[in-house]
């Protein structure tokens, strides 16, 4: 398969690009230049790998979920344990890389958006480590859902700005973070949390997250002497999935499955299934599939999981859908909750609600596969942050 994206202008087929105001163009080009240089600099790579190993705690285990496998029948189920990273999710793979990039570029301050709070915590964490000032924008609704993560960020020295505009969720937080960046661009780096935004952000985030898929390949081959037949990951903006999928893109014998949030159901207005129900448009500097109405107004996304309710999806996922290399599906709030409880009871592992969407789809897929086949789930984060809201949700039902 001939797959080499993005092109030199930052496009993934028709997707991606740089739809930014003139005031940001210089910074985006400067970032691209700095990133290319860093990727070719052995000292930068050495420093990044040092932190990934000694600070983040990589590599993360590839765990054979024996009880889940027995319960499902069919394929052997493996979990890539990103929940065991420092700060409890995959997000830090990207924030440590970008923070080192910010230091390299001479920036003193970092701005970021966050939905579930995981990216905010991971950003505040690396800023504390590297002595950078940190400002985090978070939607009002997400602040309510994720009080503990807000307190964590503040403990780490970050200033958390609550965003009341719009639906008070991730989309609105990104808007405000971009506005802030425009007016502080001389001394501030924007750490985008997913494979979104203008080029080079989708590529930078994908490349820093590719450690997930690269490790998985190596670990699975060491255990089974081959590659897995299927790989499953959840998708909001799509960074854990892109990090897992990208190293497998050329291995056409490996089926790749992306799982979006169907919320209350894709037939309702309350979902975040962008690739299932969306259409092409531009948001936050990039062309991609979006949830929008006929006038092109962005619709609110809904999911029980704060990290999946973004109304767009990364440009590379948009392309991978169109060319059929990744198969995209969606899982409802109720199915994700069920999978959350099942994994907790069967394996003693409490997954994030985001990751529970991937687990739920894997539960449907595994029984359709043969016993000598393997299925890897990207367990993108741990569920501590969700326990309180799940308790509330279960009491209401």
Curated annotation (Swiss-Prot):
Keywords: Amino-acid biosynthesis, Aromatic amino acid biosynthesis, Lyase, Pyridoxal phosphate, Tryptophan biosynthesis. The keyword Amino-acid biosynthesis applies. Pathway: Amino-acid biosynthesis; L-tryptophan biosynthesis; L-tryptophan from chorismate: step 5/5. SUPFAM superfamilies: Tryptophan synthase beta subunit-like PLP-dependent enzymes. GO terms for cellular component: cytoplasm. The modification N6-(pyridoxal phosphate)lysine is found at residue 91. GO terms for molecular function: tryptophan synthase activity. Its EC number is 4.2.1.20. It catalyses: (1S,2R)-1-C-(indol-3-yl)glycerol 3-phosphate + L-serine = D-glyceraldehyde 3-phosphate + L-tryptophan + H2O. The keyword Lipid metabolism does not apply. Its cofactor is pyridoxal 5'-phosphate. It holds the Pfam family PALP. Tetramer of two alpha and two beta chains. The beta subunit is responsible for the synthesis of L-tryptophan from indole and L-serine. Belongs to the TrpB family. This is Tryptophan synthase beta chain. It comes from Bacillus anthracis. The lineage of its organism: Bacteria, Bacillati, Bacillota, Bacilli, Bacillales. The gene is trpB.
């Amino acid at each position: 398969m001939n797959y080499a994206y993005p092109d030199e202008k930052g496009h993934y087929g028709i997707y991606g690009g740089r739809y930014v105001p003139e005031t940001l163009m210089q910074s985006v080009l400067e970032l691209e230049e700095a990133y290319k240089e860093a990727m070719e600099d052995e000292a930068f790579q050495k420093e990044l790998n040092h932190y990934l190993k000694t600070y983040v705690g990589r590599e993360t285990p590839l765990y054979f979920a024996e009880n889940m496998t027995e319960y499902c029948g069919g394929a052997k189920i493996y979990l890539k344990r990103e929940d065991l990273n420092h700060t409890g999710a995959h997000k830090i793979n990207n924030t440590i890389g970008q923070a080192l990039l910010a230091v390299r570029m001479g920036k003193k301050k970092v701005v970021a958006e966050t939905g579930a709070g995981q990216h905010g915590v991971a950003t505040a964490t690396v800023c504390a480590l590297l002595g950078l000032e940190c400002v985090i924008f978070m939607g009002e609704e997400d602040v309510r859902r994720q009080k503990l993560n807000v307190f964590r960020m503040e403990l780490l020295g970050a200033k958390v700005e609550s965003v009341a505009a719009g639906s008070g969720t991730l989309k609105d937080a990104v808007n405000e973070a971009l506005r802030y960046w425009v007016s502080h661009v001389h001394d501030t780096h924007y750490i985008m949390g997913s494979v979104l935004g203008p080029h080079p952000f989708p590529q930078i985030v994908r490349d820093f997250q590719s450690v997930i898929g690269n490790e998985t390949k190596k670990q699975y081959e060491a255990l089974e002497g081959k590659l897995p037949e299927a790989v499953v990951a959840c998708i909001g903006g799509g960074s854990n999935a892109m990090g897992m999928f990208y190293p497998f893109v050329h291995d056409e014998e490996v089926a790749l499955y992306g799982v979006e949030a169907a919320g209350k159901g894709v037939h309702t207005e309350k979902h975040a299934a962008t690739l299932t129900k969306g259409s092409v448009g531009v948001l936050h500097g990039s062309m991609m599939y979006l949830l929008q109405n006929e006038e092109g107004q962005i619709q609110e996304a809904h999911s029980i999981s704060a990290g999946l309710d973004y109304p767009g999806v990364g440009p590379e996922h948009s392309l991978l859908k169109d060319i059929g290399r990744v198969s995209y599906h969606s899982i409802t709030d109720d199915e994700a909750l069920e999978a959350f409880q099942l994994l907790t009871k069967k394996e003693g592992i409490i997954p994030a609600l985001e990751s529970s969407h991937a687990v739920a789809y894997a539960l449907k897929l595994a029984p359709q596969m043969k016993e000598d086949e393997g299925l890897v789930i990207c367990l993108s984060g741990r569920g501590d942050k969700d326990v309180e809201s799940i308790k509330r949700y279960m009491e209401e039902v």
